[in-house]
Amino acid sequence: MSRHSTSSVTETTAKNMLWGSELNQEKQTCTFRGQGEKKDSCKLLLSTICLGEKAKEEVNRVEVLSQEGRKPPITIATLKASVLPMVTVSGIELSPPVTFRLRTGSGPVFLSGLECYETSDLTWEDDEEEEEEEEEEDEDEDADISLEEIPVKQVKRVAPQKQMSIAKKKKVEKEEDETVVRPSPQDKSPWKKEKSTPRAKKPVTKK
């Protein structure tokens, strides 16, 4: 099995959490600041802004305030119950702190999205190699077990002397078959039989 030098690989993964807030006449602003020690790497992915079921028939405008008020507010949704009660927002990533404000209307307006935290995991290539080696060892063990379970059938071999005697016997039987000559139909004809039998000579009388 091949060995490789140890080296570290940093992988960046994202951990997402649901986020939501409400804007109404009593609470016209809300600020997202992130949570925990990872708030510096946090992003807010806004998804939907919608009116509540108790919203009045009036225009409700939601805007985002810039940090420290350096830039003018940006309107992200203008809602009305009978016309547009909900909007779907996509592709907006906001870095905390982010402040939302209900500029006009009494709401209630609900905002929802995802808190996205980036985390760095330090993984080692050796750990992956060890896992691969363990898998290969398991496969080898399974193959050995399967070979042990297969029954081995023993084949009986005939002794050389016995083989020679059998071959000799077959040869003798073949020679005997060749020596036996069967009479042909011509040998059975009466003419040939009479010709083959010699006639008796008549005695000659001396004068």
Curated annotation (Swiss-Prot):
Keywords in alphabetical order: Chaperone, Chromatin regulator, Developmental protein, Fertilization, Nucleus
Ranges of compositional bias, category Acidic residues: 123-147
Site label Interaction between pentamers, positions: E57, L84
Biased composition (Polar residues): 1-15
GO molecular function, one term: chromatin binding
Subcellular location as annotated: Nucleus
Stretch list, region Acidic tract A2: 129-152
Domain of life: Eukaryota
Basic residues: compositionally biased ranges: 198-207
Region listing for Disordered, in residue ranges: 1-20, 121-207
Major subcellular site: nucleus
TM spans (from-to): none
Pfam families: Nucleoplasmin (PF03066)
Similarity comment text for this entry: Belongs to the nucleoplasmin family.
Subunit field text: Homopentamer, when bound to H2A-H2B dimers only. Homodecamer of two stacked pentamers, when bound to H2A-H2B dimers and H3-H4 tetramers simultaneously.
PANTHER family per record: NUCLEOPLASMIN (PTHR22747), NUCLEOPLASMIN-2 (PTHR22747:SF14)
Summary of the function given for this chain in its UniProt record: Core histones chaperone involved in chromatin reprogramming, specially during fertilization and early embryonic development. Probably involved in sperm DNA decondensation during fertilization.
Record comment regarding domains: The acidic tract A2 mediates histone binding.
UniProt protein name: Nucleoplasmin-2
Gene source species: Mus musculus
